[in-house]
Amino acid sequence: MSAPADNQARDEPLLVARQLSKWYGRQLGCRDVSFELYPGEVLAIVGESGSGKTTLLQLLSCQLAADAGEALYRTRDGALRDLAQLGEAERRFLFRTDWGYVHQDPALGLRMSISAGGNVGERLMAVGWRRYGAIRSAAAEWLDRVEIDRSRIDDPPRTYSGGMRQRLQIARNLVTNPRLVFMDEPTGGLDASVQARLLDLLRGLVGELHLAAVIVTHDLAVARLLSHRIMVMKGGEAIEQGLTDQVLDDPHAPYTQLLVSSILPA
């Protein structure tokens, strides 16, 4: 994916990781991971199972506490805040307003027993919307944007296909115009045709909404299509990072070379 159109030199980073580290007892989760993410930029974190990419995503999204290092987020007032120093109420506020989180399993990010419109509307109510007509109208518009027929607005997601559930989860996350979205294997477990449709949708929305995103994926084709920058992880460490096309077309680390040659078509 080509770089964002905006000149990043004029922006300040939205999310900063400085030597983030996490252990599970004696087992390393990740160690000394550092990067900066700018507004409108998408970072893909790739690597095989157990490489540390999911641990890193959980650290960045405040689901785990780091053992060393820090994760900093630039709030809307321009302050760069240490996420570890935020109270629980402040973190919940971030997830309601500034952040989204797209799970690999949509059931983790949706309420399966309430309607699709209710799932989207809940996010709006959490940021202060109160008029039923406006909430329902916004939910219907977002169903359109994620290519779900409006006639399904009153159906619960348990009646949806896997691809539809994932698109609904995306609508639920993006309806409040977040600045940063975390995605954990967003296309995992989907058939190839469904995955391709979802990728096209995600790519369009990320560009249209000028979203910053951190995407964990094992699929280098997904990373190439969606991300501006890529980080390759192995054994809990970031062994290579840079512009996605440059890293995938000319990998320097031996492990990255192996990963690219074994997964990407010649």
Model-identified regions with their sequence ranges:
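The feature captures the beta-strand-to-loop junction immediately N-terminal to the Walker
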Residues: 46-48
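Helix-to-loop junction immediately C-terminal to a conserved catalytic motif
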Residues: 61
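ABC ATPase NBD coupling module
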Residues: 79-100, 118, 126, 247-251
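Conserved ABC ATPase "signature" region
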Residues: 134-151
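Conserved ABC ATPase signature
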Residues: 156-160, 164
